Amino acid sequence: MTLEMRMVELETRQAFQDDTIQALNDVVVEQGRVIDRLQLQMAELIKRHEEMVGQYGSEGEEAPPPHY
């Protein structure tokens, strides 16, 4: 393999690696956005749960069924 052929091979590999790195970066950025949305949704669900527990009491405070 000549030096020129090796250089072409290395440049070709680098081009493919650059494309792969960019694609992976795009995925990581999108996953970050998804995580941010999920964290907001989770915070909202926790808030709603705490409000419901405050209104209706916790599950442990439930009266026993009438047959006891």
Swiss-Prot record:
Provide the disulphide bond pattern.
none
Superkingdom, natural source: Bacteria
One Pfam family per UniProt: SlyX
InterPro entries noted in UniProt? SlyX
Q: What family classification does the UniProt entry report for this protein?
A: Belongs to the SlyX family.
**PANTHER family reported in the protein's UniProt record:** PROTEIN SLYX
Name this protein carries in UniProt: Protein SlyX homolog
**Organism taxonomic ancestry:** Bacteria, Pseudomonadati, Pseudomonadota, Gammaproteobacteria, Pseudomonadales
